[in-house]
Each structure stands twice: as structure tokens, then as C-alpha cells.
Amino acid sequence: GVQTCALPIYPKQPAEVEVVLFTPRKEVMTSFKHIVRPEDILIHKRGTTHVTPHRYMLRSGNEKECIDVAILAEGYTEKEMNVFYQDAQKACESLFSHEPFRSMKNKFNIVAVASPSVDSGVSVPRENQWKHTAVHSHFDTFYSDRYLTTSRVKAIHNALAGIPYEHIIILANTDVYGGGGIYNSYTLTTAHHAMFKPVVVHEFGHSFAGLADEYFYEDDVMTDTYPLDVEPWEQNISTRVNFASKWKDMLAPNTPVPTPAT
């Protein structure tokens, strides 16, 4: 099944954690509550030993005052880690070549985390290629050739244990086009495709800022994600059910909506 992870502050006293799932119509689908007891002997305190090797690409300040982004290696063997660090530096430079990241660069720390894989590259199910990699990523998510994700979210966080982070970028060691970004979870993109630099920024917009895709493909697996009678929560798209809550006030008077392509 698909895993997810929450990153609550470690409580000093027993604390209730609640997870609520919503439908695309913003209706509660189901919920789950769990009591976290800090004295529980079955809580594995990871990150105190065996911390994954890592190197800072950018260190602007204390982790308590900055946004900490971890760039994680996927599909890089131990012998390929120098390549990974070079790729991580390219991702960092690409991110801060765009606004608003460029003007806020001093608010970020970027750390490259060298999580090793047994095999080089990533899995491609449609070609019957399954590899043993750090976070078990693969193409063909939802049977879409380009959609590269992993369902092994716990493996991601285990690899990052002991390293300060709030957001995650995973670099896949392949030249095949693809990627994915899941809000408040992770960005995953291929590091050796010609479109790597813009794609990593695009996918980070999904995972970091909660932005939606602004393009459309025929027969896309995500085509029916948004009911047309409900205003999406993402700030960069609209069904015009409540367009005033988005960017309507930024349009010039008499601008037709939808706006014809010119």
C-alpha cells in the first residue's frame, strides 16, 4: 500500500494525532486518531547513530530559523556519489535562479544526502526493469510513462533521520524524462534528462507550495481530479466557482475569461 509520514514535534506528554482524508469535494472521507506516548519502548529513535552521509550545498543559518530542504540520492551507487553531489548542486542552483526563491535564498538551508543504492538507475515497470534502490522509486505510476514516484515514504524519512529537514527533493539517477511532486511530501525528478533543471523547480512547486499543474493532456490519468462545481484549494488554478478568491482582482478590466490564446 501507499505510505505517508507526518512530522509532528516530538511530544513531552501523550499527544493525540489525527489524520483526516477529504474527497475532491472537500467532504470528509475518513479519519484516524492515534495517541503518541513518548515513553513507548517501541518508538525507534532513529538518527542518533548511523546517520546517512551528507553535505551542505547552502547553509544560510540555524535550522530553527531557516527552511531546511534535503536533496536525497536515488539510484546512485556508492561509487556514483560524486555524480550525485554534482547533480544536487545543479538542482540547488536551478531552484535559486527563480523567484521567489532567489530573493529568499538567505532563508534556506540545502543539504545533499548520499543515500546509496545497490543498483544504478531506477525501475521502469513497462520494460520489466525492477531495481534495488534507496527509496524504491519507479516510473509508470498510475500507468503514466512519465510519472515517477515512490510509495515507500518511510524509506525516505529513515534515510533522512538525524538530519534537519522540512522538505524533500529526490534526484533519480536516470536520463529518462519524468518526475512527480506531492504536496508536503516530496519532489522526485530525473537528474540527467535535458529538462532536469526546469522540471525540478516545477515539481518543487507542487511539493513545497501546493501548486497544481496548469497544463492538460488528452487521456491524462489526472484529468478528472477536480469537480467543475467546486473551487480547487490550489491557489494557481480555478474552476471559476469562486474566482474572486484567486487572481481575479489582478486581471485588467474587460479581460475575457477564459482568455483566448494569442
Residue ranges and their predicted role:
Residues 5-7:
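Short, small-residue-biased leader/transition segments that mark boundaries at the very start
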Residues 12-26:
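Short, aromatic- and glycine-rich surface loops/edge beta-strands on solvent-exposed regions
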Residues 25-59:
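Short beta-strand elements
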